[in-house]
Amino acid sequence: MNDVIRDFFKMESAGGILLVIAAAIAMVIANSPLNESYQAVLHTYVFGMSVSHWINDGLMAIFFLLIGLEVKRELLEGALKSRETAIFPAIAAVGGMLAPALIYVAFNGNDPEAIKGWAIPAATDIAFALGIMALLGKRVPVSLKVFLLALAIIDDLGVVVIIALFYSGDLSTLALTVGFAMTGVLFMLNAKNVTKLIWYIVVGFILWVAVLKSGVHATLAGVVIGFSIPLQGKKGEHSPLKHMEHALHPYVAFAILPVFAFANAGISLEGVSLSGLTSMLPLGIALGLLVGKPLGIFTFSWAAVKFGVAKLPEGVNFKHIFAVSVLCGIGFTMSIFISSLAFGGANPDFDTYSRLGILMGSTTAAVLGYFLLHVSLPKTAAESEKAIS
């Protein structure tokens, strides 16, 4: 289908391996004598923010910018162009947020402190999910990759809204006003057919700063910028959107995502007890991710097709959808972020055990999701092409 996406995921397969290696190294370091140095580096302040915040709010905004570009292009000229195919991942994402939250509440609804973490298993870590899928290379149909892209970004946008509504203590009205104004400027540039990317970069940077200062998760700015970049260039010009995609791909695949994994995967197991590990909090999170995610995504997807609201993407069957739904149980970094908002300051023990629940659920979902994809996909790239044609 689209050579740009194929090239991206071909390169991403190597990036996916780096992602897993970086996460594994971080876990080893966090549980070794080097943990103190590891934490010290991440919490070192540079230009008013810690290194960890620069990675999660700065570098990851670039990743979300790339995702915004990918999804916009697919909506306009690719696999999500029709209403039926575009609505499919949106419905799946809604199910993928509702079911995990309900499972968590079933385990922790009677605890007034633990209930604050109800949104923790509702998240999907798009970076890790894409990295695991990319390990299977060209065996994965392009349409299935696009489905995961769209589902995960809608899921993450939903979580951003949840954070803004339920976990943002002090929202800055001034910063939000500037953010909305810059969003308007970006789409005005698009409407006026401005194709020079420098204008989008300058205004987008101001938007990112405004969103960062507003109290809302700064990565949302990357998505907005991505959707504002024009797909069509002026006569005789290349597509600005595709040009930016090509420019960002190697940096995202081989630098940003591995650094992101290294900075976020280091969870210390010091002081952890078996009774704490099997308590309602970590179990609710782990089962929310491992059971709730696939239950919600698959059920809503099946119902959407069954009742004629949407249709399956080309070359994709329900075995593939179920495998991807399990893969979406990798909540990891976005879940950890919500955990820190819910428990970090007031209850460090809750924060520790919630992170372990996230780790248990996400790791199991990653292994099981990879296995299910491996056995359900065509054995070769050629067979995958034949299934689509």
From Swiss-Prot:
Subcellular location: Cell inner membrane
Principal location listed in the UniProt entry: membrane
Residue ranges that the Swiss-Prot or TrEMBL entry lists as coiled coil: none
Cellular component aspect of the GO annotation: plasma membrane
Keywords: Antiport, Cell inner membrane, Cell membrane, Ion transport, Membrane, Sodium, Sodium transport, Transmembrane, Transmembrane helix, Transport
The keyword Ubl conjugation belongs to this UniProt entry's keyword annotation: no
Its membrane topology: Multi-pass membrane protein
Molecular function, one GO term: sodium:proton antiporter activity
Cited Pfam families: Na_H_antiport_1
Catalytic activity: Na(+)(in) + 2 H(+)(out) = Na(+)(out) + 2 H(+)(in)
GO BP of this protein: regulation of pH
Membrane-traversing stretches: 14-34, 47-67, 87-107, 117-137, 146-166, 171-191, 197-217, 252-272, 280-300, 321-341, 356-376
Function field: Na(+)/H(+) antiporter that extrudes sodium in exchange for external protons.
Entry-linked PANTHER family: NA(+)_H(+) ANTIPORTER NHAA (PTHR30341:SF0), SODIUM ION/PROTON ANTIPORTER NHAA-RELATED (PTHR30341)
Family to which this protein belongs: Belongs to the NhaA Na(+)/H(+) (TC 2.A.33) antiporter family.
Protein name, entry field: Na(+)/H(+) antiporter NhaA
Protein source organism: Vibrio vulnificus (strain YJ016)
Gene for this chain: nhaA
